[in-house]
Amino acid sequence: MESKLSFESFFYNESKKAYFQKLMEKLDEEYEKYQVFPNKKDLFRAIELTNFATLKIVIIGQDPYHRKGQADGLAFSTRTKILPPSLRNLFLEIKNAYPNFSKENGNLENWAKQGVLLLNHVLTVRKSSPNSHKNIGWEVFSSNLINFIVKNKVDIVFLLLGKKAKLAVKNINLEKQKVFAYSHPSPFSFAKSLKNSMVFRKINDFLKEKKRLEINWNL
């Protein structure tokens, strides 16, 4: 049964729903009137790069980076040379768990290809306006995507970073999954619980326990 399921099949079914069509219409207007991130071609990059059959981890963020050139369609990832503070703190926490960690850029594409779904709860944002695309339909899309995963998979690692990520799964049954919940890596909240949590090692320990390939965070 699972072999027939894919993110492509999920997207095809979702795209026929009324809320999704309204969301796409709204986004057409937004892209026409404002600078919106990420680029349209990168909107669904998270589910394009990660294979449902080999999915291991779901990392849930809030909404994309709102400065020009930063957002690339993957939560926390960026193509810019200068790392946004949240990503810099994530890397600090990985280095805390793996002292030899030395990733030189913020492009997390290879995490996605290893089975890490990097999902923002809201997938778009206006330039310099965080939360500007709240309640236009993305929350429904993200919740439906997470439900699709938990109904068809077990032992998926969910890393929830921040209050909004926790709210994203509030009404979803994650009993058959492995959940890690910590503060957001932003400078304002990093130290609350994410810092020194060793969560990236804990994730790999869990994968190892389940006899699955560990994630190489350096890639």
Curated annotation (Swiss-Prot):
Keywords of this entry: Cytoplasm, DNA damage, DNA repair, Hydrolase
Pfam families hit by this protein: UDG (PF03167)
MF terms in GO: uracil DNA N-glycosylase activity
Group of enzyme by EC: hydrolase
Protein localization: Cytoplasm
Active-site residues per Swiss-Prot or TrEMBL entry: 63
Record-listed E.C. numbers: 3.2.2.27
Catalysed reactions, semicolon-separated: Hydrolyzes single-stranded DNA or mismatched double-stranded DNA and polynucleotides, releasing free uracil
Matches recorded under InterPro entries: UDG_fam1, Ura-DNA_Glyclase_AS, Uracil-DNA_glycosylase-like, Uracil-DNA_glycosylase-like_sf
Cellular component terms per the entry's GO annotation: cytoplasm
Principal localisation: cytoplasm
PROSITE patterns associated with the record: U_DNA_GLYCOSYLASE (PS00130)
UniProt-listed SUPFAM superfamilies: Uracil-DNA glycosylase-like
Biological process terms in GO annotation: base-excision repair, AP site formation via deaminated base removal
SMART domains: UDG (SM00986), UreE_C (SM00987)
Family affiliation: Belongs to the uracil-DNA glycosylase (UDG) superfamily. UNG family.
Function statement: Excises uracil residues from the DNA which can arise as a result of misincorporation of dUMP residues by DNA polymerase or due to deamination of cytosine.
Protein name (record): Uracil-DNA glycosylase
Biological source species: Mesomycoplasma hyopneumoniae (strain 7448) (Mycoplasma hyopneumoniae)
